[in-house]
Curated annotation (Swiss-Prot):
Record EC number: 5.3.3.2
Function: Involved in the biosynthesis of isoprenoids. Catalyzes the 1,3-allylic rearrangement of the homoallylic substrate isopentenyl (IPP) to its allylic isomer, dimethylallyl diphosphate (DMAPP).
GO biological process: isoprenoid biosynthetic process
Compartments in which it is found: Cytoplasm
Residue positions binding Mg(2+): 160
InterPro entries for this protein: Aldolase_TIM, FMN-dep_DH, IPdP_isomerase
Organism of provenance: Picrophilus torridus (strain ATCC 700027 / DSM 9790 / JCM 10055 / NBRC 100828 / KAW 2/3)
Coiled coil segments of this chain: none
Annotated protein name in UniProt: Isopentenyl-diphosphate delta-isomerase
Listed GO MF terms: FMN binding; isopentenyl-diphosphate delta-isomerase activity; magnesium ion binding; NADPH binding; oxidoreductase activity
Residue numbers binding FMN: 61-64, 92, 120, 189, 219, 269-271, 290-291
Keyword annotations from UniProtKB, A to Z: Cytoplasm, Flavoprotein, FMN, Isomerase, Isoprene biosynthesis, Magnesium, Metal-binding, NADP
Length: 349
């Protein structure tokens, strides 16, 4: 069942080492400004994303839904999004179509005033697999379930290749995406492997409004599926999960590749407000956080709130030390890049 798989994903993400071997945000070093000429309390962290005003350039990335544990997590995350006036996504919502009894694990966020809500479906479910693809009515139901402002379509074909229940068809996804983008504000999102420039051009041609890079550097779904396979004693899937543990395009490089005129969300391996600042300096409008919030969200709102306060404090300190009075000025702060990220930035030159 999908619900059981989602519960497994939460437990593994919380309790096992499922991150890639290298975090590429560490390959960016920021030039320090010793004389900032900025007062800390005057720093403006506000940002506008596709017409929506956020107090901070932060998106609570799509994580979960479909189980009672997920309901608790989504509730605490929604309270956090309301408190800080930032955007929030939910996990893949196909389960709510298959089992209407899970709907409240997503719709719980409707109890809170969130500046922007992001519904979420998987790209593999846009085309026929062993079962039917999501219909237009299914997508409308999902979108309306949380009164969404945006529709995330997540691309997770690496995960689909690794997991036993994976959907392996992709032909026709862009055509269907183009149809959907005519009716919804679609955000294309990778889930840990990043988008290339070729991908970004295809997505923008299909009509997506923004790209969430979800690059290599943070949670590896190949790693998560490795641990699932280990529990099931599935030697072949264990081998595949281990082989592709570090597959993908680094998050910072993917931001550069996808910066083609429409907003970019930088996600994949963000750990703190310093990483967030680096994402913005590389061209992102928002930074997406998932793993850093998940465990706290399964505990209490106060724990998530404290974590978010630390992220924001880090961001503001970075802005202070780069003489950035606002987010626009932060985008122009100076930095250097180190290997191995530097080589990735040469790919399209």
């Amino acid at each position: 069942m999908i619900e059981n798989r989602k519960e497994e994903h939460i437990k593994i993400a919380e309790n096992e080492n499922v991150v890639s071997e290298h975090n590429f945000w560490d390959d960016i070093r920021i030039v320090h400004r010793a004389i900032p000429e900025v007062d800390f309390n005057d720093i403006d962290t506000g940002v506008k994303f596709l017409g929506k005003q956020f107090n901070y350039p932060i998106l609570i990335s799509s994580m979960t839904g479909g189980t009672e544990t997920a309901k608790i997590i989504n509730k605490n995350l929604a309270m956090t999004a309301e408190h800080f006036k930032i955007g929030m996504g939910v996990g893949s919502m196909r389960v709510a179509v298959k089992n209407k009894n899970t709907a409240d694990t997503f719709s719980v966020i409707n109890d809170y005033k969130i500046p922007a809500k992001f519904a979420n479906i998987g790209a593999p479910q846009l085309v026929r697999q062993d079962s039917d693809s999501l219909s237009d009515n299914d997508i409308e139901y999902i979108y309306n379930l949380i009164n969404a402002d945006f529709l995330i379509v997540h691309f997770n074909f690496l995960q689909e290749m690794v997991q036993p229940e994976g959907d392996r068809n992709s032909k026709g996804v862009i055509k269907r995406l183009k149809d959907i983008a005519g009716s919804y504000n679609v955000i294309a999102k990778e889930t840990g492997s990043g988008f290339s420039k070729e991908d970004a051009l295809s997505l923008l041609d299909a009509g997506v409004k923004a790209i969430d890079v979800g690059g290599l550097g943070g949670t590896s779904f190949a790693a998560i599926e490795y641990y699932r396979a280990q529990k099931a004693n599935d030697e072949i899937k264990m081998h595949t999960g281990k082989a592709f543990w570090n597959w993908g395009i680094p998050s910072p490089a993917s931001i550069k590749y996808c910066s083609l005129g429409e907003p970019v969300i930088g996600s994949g391996g963000l750990r703190n407000g310093l990483d967030l600042a680096k994402a913005i300096m590389f061209g992102a409008t928002l930074g997406g956080f998932a793993r850093e919030l998940l465990k706290d969200a399964n505990t209490s709102f106060d724990d998530v709130k404290r974590q978010m306060e630390m992220i924001i404090n880090d961001l503001k300190i970075t802005m202070m030390l780069t003489s950035s009075r606002n987010i626009d000025e932060l985008k122009h702060a100076r930095y250097i890049t180190l290997e191995p990220l530097r080589s990735w930035l040469e790919v399209y030159k």
